UniProtKB/Swiss-Prot annotation:
Protein task: Cell division protein that is involved in the assembly of the Z ring. May serve as a membrane anchor for the Z ring.
Single GO BP term: FtsZ-dependent cytokinesis
Cellular compartments per GO CC: cell division site; cytoplasmic side of plasma membrane
Keywords noted in UniProt: Cell cycle, Cell division, Cell membrane, Membrane
Assembly: Self-interacts. Interacts with FtsZ.
Protein family: Belongs to the FtsA/MreB family.
Keyword Cell division: yes
Topology relative to the membrane: Peripheral membrane protein
Pfam families the record matches: FtsA, FtsA_C, SHS2_FTSA
Chief location: membrane
Record bears the keyword Heme: no
UniProt-recorded name of the protein: Cell division protein FtsA
Amino acid sequence: MAKTGMYVGLDIGTTSVKVVVAEYIEGQMNIIGVGNAKSDGLNRGIVVDIDQTVQAIQRAVRQAEEKAGIQIKSVNVGLPANLLEVESCQGMIAVSSESKEITDEDVRNVASAALVRSTPPERQIVAILPQDFTVDGFEGIKDPRGMLGVRMEMFGVVYTGPKTIIHNIRKCVEKAGLGINELVITPLALTETILTDGEKDFGTIVIDMGGGQTTTSVIHDKQLKFTHVNQEGGEFITKDISIVLNTSFNNAEALKINYGDAYPERTSANEEFPVDVIGKSEPVRVDERYLSEIIEARVEQILRKSKEVLDEIDAFELPGGVVLTGGAASMPGIVDLAQEIFEANVKLYVPNHMGLRNPVFANVISIVEYSAQLNDIYHIAKYAIPGEKSKPAQSVAVQQEVRYDTYAEQPQEEYEEFNERESGEKVTGKIKDFFSNIFD
């Protein structure tokens, strides 16, 4: 059961920055504030302009503060999976106290012993997750505090990431005037919170299709075993539409949202709509099937890249199938196309919160839920990581009376609209055919 209190999640995405404020009362999560601001400071999930990213964070935070009636002081911020590495770790110590009763200090010491490793200078430890402990040969202990023992071992998982990415995210958040309670690995939070216990135990693939990149994750035995980032996302679909139809990026985005379908067999060549073409005085009629074929080409390329890396580790043998989420995954037809490509059971995850029933909010909600579920053992072990502070900051300061009902009053249309940014990546495969045929 989640702790009681207020939790704030921050998801810094390529196309938007999202903030969610949630109040937990007796384990019930109630979302009381949401912010969503266009992001101009990232490219393919990586911060490329700190000042613009800071401004987007501040806009999203202000929106959430106004709706929740609180002042946000610190956040739980998501960390992308770019160049993330996962390793097993093990540590062993002698219990230090004379009474041989295991204390918080012993747990921290055994976590420190597990972190004794040679970490390359360009990388740093992001998180350590204790799995279980062994006390004097007794295995499978989840919380050894208060037990008697002479020798204690800890088995867990350690995650490391590039210092540059981590530093830039921290810098943006701190420059926006916020503290950081938890730096949460986004695919870890996603797989932990959107899957059932059975899916996490027996093994499931999660594909998060964002605006600037697609993250493929595999969870098995309730552990995040594998992540892979493909630097293609929803904004690439928009870019393809813009180039092939010779229309502006904004028009292409509107076409994708209003008429887009990733599975041409579901569309009709008889259904047409007008497109404002650059260099022409009158709109050009384009049929629904042709637009769908443009979209299908890019989506198929993205999904096949995921399939390649998943085939290498035999991930499709896991019984949990594939779960799609993220803003780009909400397009009609993607589940059908994914089932055809993966030859596996595929489903779309949509958050079950009033006003936020859109996969685009899956990450930020997962960050909140994951942070709220972290236990004492995690926090004790976390302070064994070099540079971690001993106490988290207070998340919010209440400015006015807060309503703790579920977040249903704010219509989704109020969220700031945004257009996905342009990308210069060279398009391959079937997309090349569109670019050549358009001039025939």
